[in-house]
Regions:
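Sec-dependent N-terminal signal peptides
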Residues: 4-14
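Short, exposed beta-strand-loop hairpins at the edges of beta-sheets
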Residues: 112-115, 119-132
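Short, low-complexity, Pro/Ser/Thr/Gly-rich segments in the mature regions of secreted, periplasmic
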Residues: 129-143
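Long, charged/polar, surface-exposed segments that mediate recognition or autoinhibition
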Residues: 47-108
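Short, solvent-exposed secondary-structure boundary motifs
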Residues: 35-47, 101-105, 109-117
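N-terminal leader/targeting segments
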Residues: 8, 17-63, 76-79
Length: 143
């Protein structure tokens, strides 16, 4: 994945309030350096540190995660907004697939986007043991 694509995606995710616009400037190098960066979830005031990790098969991924109260409706709204934003950013050439259901008491929803060899995942996960629900953004980065 080209570094400018990641920066462009982050810009698209951040358009909105002034604080989100400020956040965009901080994330222009997301995926192009090993530095952890802070990203604000679109439509919310929730910020998190995004981190880069290595993938066993090669390359790396940038992960961002936002915690909500367990099964909070706001988490579902934020997840749907993030899915919509990523879809709009990637355009009609992107394909989106939903992950299969899991046999587990916690809720899980993953939407994976593929476009021109790029992969972006947006997920919503209930963690009963932690009494929290998470929205995750994962961007595959080829090194």
């Amino acid at each position: 994945m080209k570094p400018h694509f990641v920066a462009g995606l982050i810009f698209m995710l951040s358009v909105g309030s002034a604080s989100e616009a400020d956040m965009c400037e901080k994330t222009l190098t997301l995926g192009t350096s090993n530095a952890d960066l802070t990203l604000t979830l679109p439509g919310t005031e929730k910020s998190t540190k995004c981190t880069r990790s290595l993938v066993l098969s090669g390359g790396s991924q940038v992960h961002c995660g936002w915690a909500f109260t367990y099964r909070a409706p706001e988490a579902t709204v934020a997840f749907e907004r993030l899915v919509s934003t990523v879809a709009d950013c990637l355009g009609t050439e992107a394909s989106m697939t939903a992950d299969q259901d899991v046999n587990h008491p916690d809720f899980y929803d993953l939407q994976t986007f593929q476009s021109k060899g790029r992969e972006i995942g947006v997920s919503l996960k209930d963690k009963a043991g932690l009494s929290e629900t998470y929205v995750f953004l994962r961007i595959a980065v080829s090194d």
